[in-house]
Amino acid sequence: FKVKTGFSTHAEDMSRLERLAAILPADASLRIDYNQGLAAVDAIRTLRDVEAFRPAFIEQPVARDRRDAMAEITRAIDTPILADESVFTPQEAADLVARRYADAVSIKLMKAGGFTAARTIAAITGAAGLPA
């Protein structure tokens, strides 16, 4: 189950996640997408709270251009961090590989500019052992 968060207060997000966790089967996979909704200064503290729900991954917690913050989050949080809006081009994929600001990448054909660019992004990140 993928949950979009980061548009409400942290308390409201936590309440929503608690309600969802109460009704999901124990073996359900929870994926949390912040859609760049967290302020970098609060992200690690917020995501440590969210880790209580054992998400499979946390997607794009901060703004796409906050790659230094993404790197700090990736090092500080046990849950894998998935880059989405941070990687639209092969150059951004190379930057991800060099700086390791996420544990995996979400590749979308439309955002990448088509199949060829998406394959290039997958090749770059895959060669570095980052799942797509």
Regions found by a protein language model. Name each.
Residues 1-77:
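Metal-dependent enolase-superfamily TIM-barrel catalytic cores that perform enediolate-based chemistry
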Residues 48, 54, 65-82, 87-132:
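Shared catalytic-loop signature of beta/alpha-barrel
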